[in-house]
Amino acid sequence: MTIAPMLTEETPANVLVARVLEEAGIEMVFGISGGHTGRIVSGLSQYQNQVRTVLVREESLGGVMAEVYGRLTRRPGVLLGQGPWVLGNGLLGTIEAHLS
């Protein structure tokens, strides 16, 4: 069995993340740009015509936006964040959206 490489040239990881989101049909990403996520947002800037990035002030707001976007459009809502903050605060936004 032969395995063909997926990439023909060296590509930065942040651009690869953006490419995967674009190829998956993701149209919107909600989150905070800072720390390591700033690099992903930078990669998403190359796909700004395909993937819209909405920056929020805190993870819980991004969680609510991603949840509501998913419910209204029946497409995946993506929350971008890092570390335990996105897990804790982002999940609060999802819970809040479910209880609304």
Where are these regions (language model features)?
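N-terminal alpha/beta PP-like core and its mobile active-site loop of ThDP/TPP-dependent enzymes
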Residues: M1-S100
